[in-house]
Amino acid sequence: EIVLRKRAVPTVGATLDALMHAGSADASIEMGQRAVRTYPYAFHVYHRTAMEWLRWEREEEIDSLWAQCVDRLPGEHLPRLYRALHEISRGNLQEGFQLREATMSIFGWLRRTTVQPPATFPEWKGESLTGKSIVIWSEFGLGDEIFFLRFARLLRERCGAAYVTVVCQSPLVKLFEESREADAVIDVKNAAQLPAHDYWVFPHTIPAYVPLELEALPPAVPFLRASPVKAPAVLLSAPRGVLKVGVVFKGAPTHENDRARSLPSLSVLDELFKLKGVEFFSLQKGAGADEAAQYAQRLSNFHDLGACIASMEETASAVAELDLVLTVDTSVSHVAGAMGKPTWVLLPSYGDWRWHYRREDSPWYPTARLFRRRFGGDWPEVVARIRGHLLVLSNEKQLAVAA
């Protein structure tokens, strides 16, 4: 009898496959609930169920799902982290960031930064900053640090901080200095030279203590500015009247979600390159740079700036000369968005929290437009949508020049 019962229990793979092919929201909810009842201690079952329910826009049920996962797996951090990210993605910023901080604080600084934060003055936990000095400490990737630079101004203007220092990774130092958002910018490699402050704080901690409404964020953009570094000549000499579009199609392959966020090949965008009146300028570095260089040799309207760009400030100078930046979710999307440049971001079905759920705009970057890969869809459908909008922009620019 025990053997027969065991045979009647579907495998995890069969359970999740059935969930993926649910034909309606109600069927998906029923199958998901059955899946977590059958495998109540398997985190990946909760995770897959949450993704499938998101397809059907059932965020309320996802709330309960992650709460159940936390209860079932009290000793694991991933349920708490994903519950926090879900809240942030929904727009519940303070609640989500508080949950996130409670989770990340378990691990200490090693999971967040490369250099230990100061031990000689305290971490900020929401105390009054009126007349105080504070350090925003380097955390996670370049895109994260660019995104959170906006909070230097927030700590001064809303919280009353008298002096704000930003400690960041080496590639960002000159770019951040040019922005003048912080009173001082220090390379994290030189953190030992940091003078005493009243407090230090990780960037992700700030919204846990400073209430923010997603639809009423403090004006911040632009908070990056192009440096005096001259943009590449091929960009400056582009014919008058053409639409100049920057392109980034891959992120760093070491990123945990890179398989979903990066395009498999530049060829995915081939339909765009056939448009007349549009010149494309690759800002690609690292992975994908060789492919971009090959395209530049084959197409007269595709130019590879990768070899001309050696720093983030040079990237910003190039972005300043473009009409539009078309990019996957990389640090360049944050550079362009923070500069107030029209930025079109290609996103996977399940994107990073800062792009939130289902939005086509970004409260954080008012000039950004989001092109999401639809659930069960592929990149060519996204590119077809982009092509239509690019054609409109190209025609508008040509008419403006003719006038």
Tell where the protein language model's regions lie, with residue ranges.
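Flexible helix-coil transition and linker loops at the boundaries of alpha-helical arrays
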Residues: 1-6
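Catalytic machinery of carbohydrate-active enzymes
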Residues: 10-403
